[in-house]
């Protein structure tokens, strides 16, 4: 049986930075930067010990930056079209190269990347990178592409707003002229003629600060300004070039792609390219960042994706429950809406786009994420993802530079992540610099995530929602408690999540249908073990009496019962 996938997302540039006093909007020289070499075998083993099966290294491919790497053979970027001193990892400048920030020796960056792949596999982890298919940096230029590869835009007819074989969309005869300064600290202003459409589908020559102005949209054969008509025959040039890029990285031994803004790229492309890649590399997984539930099945069945973000649905609902403005009852509707595709949904409570649980913009306290973690990680066999520092209660409340004080860890700036830096402790990972609360939270995450693969009932078992027979009463708060069963063979786990800020004695109704459904006998009493504490307790296990138990505040219980 395959493992339940547990992904540890890490923002590669920030993980190993040991600087303690970073300057607002500081340069790499001023603030420092983490490297591939910080992911030692010890570091990777520690990440694996958290329960991780995969690690998603975010920001690996070369992207636009304000740091000059001419000595490494890289053309500098104009600062006016780079977000932050370090730059966004989603403004790719060379699909065939590695971000030089991440290398000890920038000229040897590809070799250092290949060593990291080998090291990751040696630690028993699978290796995931980003694939950013919708847009590239405005000054995209591949210095490292194979000799027989033509660059994006190299053969474009720039007189056509849309041409099926163009790689970009043009605004003919118009200068790129956004409503902000195009010079900044450079000797001369950034110049682009004709202007090209931005990555967020702004087809004008004058995007604003809220647009993805640092990127240009890739053309997959959809004429957006011509009633969105599709022109997929003959095969568009962009399809062929992106296929080759996916095959290039697959040949490096990676195990998966997290595909940025996948639904902004036509599903027909995915349905064409993913089988091509899998024919040669059958074990590679494709994860889609998607936000439109109406398109989920389209991107699974026609687009051939393995997994989709479960953001609009479970994440949004759990966030509401954790913050107190959504009833826990709504969790049932979440799984029901994707029940037929549940194995394809990737659950998470944090990632680089979302605010930290412990931030002032979310729940303020990391403990409030415990109950949500129980639900997100344990209710199905589908994958679970956490974001580096989540397991330590990282607050994301720094005002780093381009990224303001927004409850997120910056993806644009050179910075340090306080909790991660102290956990690493210069590579010792001895927990000596962590607070008692951080140690407790880390242990909780590690225990729960490891249970996901240790316990067959969670890893591969069936699911039974108990909320339909547990309405609010003096024994149960259906707005703050969520209960379900996971079962495999003779092992049954009663999972209880408590989103309340106080401990609670609760009574859970077990319906007769539960026993019929699983073909198990009702018993007056059984002995159960809480997998989170190791404590045993005797409880009722029948449809005539409530199962009474005690649950901690902002937490829960996984009561394992041997049938």
Regions from the language model: what does each represent?
Residues 38, 42, 112-115, 241-244, ...:
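Extracytoplasmic/secreted proteins, especially bacterial periplasmic and envelope-associated proteins
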Residues 2, 18, 27, 65, ...:
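Loop/helix patches that line or flank the sugar-binding groove of alpha-linked glycan CAZymes
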Residues 1-126, 134-159, 209, 217, ...:
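N-terminal structural segment of carbohydrate-active enzymes
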Residues 48, 340, 474-479, 487-489, ...:
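A short catalytic or substrate-binding loop motif that flags glycine-/basic-rich loops and adjacent residues
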Residues 18-37, 361-365, 536-548:
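Short, polar loop/linker segments at the starts of domains and inter-domain junctions
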Residues 500-563:
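C-terminal beta-sandwich/jelly-roll accessory domains of carbohydrate-active enzymes
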Residues 2-3, 7, 11, 91-92, ...:
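Alpha-amylase-like alpha-glycosidases and glucanotransferases acting on alpha-linked glucans and related
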């Amino acid at each position: 049986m395959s493992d339940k996938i547990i992904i540890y997302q890490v923002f590669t540039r920030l993980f190993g930075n040991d600087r303690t006093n970073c300057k607002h909007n500081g340069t790499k020289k001023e603030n420092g930067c983490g490297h591939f070499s910080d992911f030692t075998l010890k570091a990777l083993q520690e990440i694996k010990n958290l329960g991780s099966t995969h690690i998603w290294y975010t920001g690996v491919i070369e992207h636009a930056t304000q740091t000059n790497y001419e000595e490494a053979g890289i053309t500098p970027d104009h600062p006016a079209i780079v977000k932050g001193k370090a730059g966004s990892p989603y403004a790719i400048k060379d699909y065939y190269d590695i971000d030089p920030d991440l290398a000890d020796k920038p000229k040897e960056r590809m070799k250092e990347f290949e060593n990291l792949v080998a090291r990751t596999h040696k630690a028993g982890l699978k290796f995931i990178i980003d694939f950013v298919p919708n847009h590239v940096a405005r000054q995209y230029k591949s210095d490292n592409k194979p000799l027989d590869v033509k660059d994006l835009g190299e053969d474009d007819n720039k007189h056509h707003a849309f041409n099926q074989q163009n790689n970009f969309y043009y605004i003919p005869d118009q200068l790129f002229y956004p409503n902000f300064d195009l010079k900044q600290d450079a000797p001369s202003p950034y110049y682009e003629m004709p202007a090209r459409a931005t990555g967020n589908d702004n087809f004008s020559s004058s995007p604003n600060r809220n647009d993805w102005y640092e990127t240009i949209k890739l053309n997959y054969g959809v004429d957006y300004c011509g009633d969105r008509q599709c022109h997929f025959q003959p095969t568009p040039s962009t399809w062929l070039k992106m296929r080759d890029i996916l095959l290039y990285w697959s040949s490096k031994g990676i195990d998966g792609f997290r595909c940025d803004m996948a639904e902004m790229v036509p599903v027909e492309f995915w349905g064409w390219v993913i089988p091509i890649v899998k024919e040669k590399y059958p074990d590679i997984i494709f994860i889609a960042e998607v936000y439109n539930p109406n398109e989920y099945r389209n991107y699974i069945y026609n687009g051939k994706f393995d997994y989709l973000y479960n953001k609009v649905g479970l994440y949004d609902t759990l966030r509401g429950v954790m913050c107190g403005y959504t009833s826990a009852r709504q969790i049932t509707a979440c799984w029901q809406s994707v029940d037929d595709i549940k194995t394809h949904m990737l659950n998470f409570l944090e990632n680089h786009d979302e605010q930290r649980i412990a931030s002032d913009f979310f729940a303020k306290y990391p403990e409030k994420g415990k109950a949500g973690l129980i639900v997100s990680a344990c209710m199905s066999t589908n994958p679970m993802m956490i974001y580096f520092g989540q397991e330590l209660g990282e607050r994301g409340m720094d005002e780093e530079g381009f990224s303001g004080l927004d409850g997120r860890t910056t993806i644009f700036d050179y910075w340090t992540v306080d909790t991660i830096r102290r956990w690493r402790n210069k590579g010792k990972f001895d927990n000596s610099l962590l607070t008692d609360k951080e140690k407790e939270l880390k242990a909780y995450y590690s225990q729960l995530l490891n249970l996901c693969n240790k316990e067959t009932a969670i890893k591969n078992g069936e699911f039974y929602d108990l909320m339909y027979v547990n309405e609010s009463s003096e024994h149960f708060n259906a707005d703050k408690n969520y209960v379900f069963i996971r079962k495999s063979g003779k092992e049954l786990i009663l999972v209880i999540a408590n989103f309340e800020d106080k401990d609670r004695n609760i009574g859970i109704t077990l319906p007769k249908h539960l026993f019929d459904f699983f073909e198990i006998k009702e018993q007056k009493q059984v002995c159960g073990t809480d997998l989170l504490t190791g404590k045993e307790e005797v409880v009722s296990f029948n449809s005539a009496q409530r199962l009474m138990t005690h649950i901690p505040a902002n937490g829960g219980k996984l009561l394992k019962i041997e049938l």
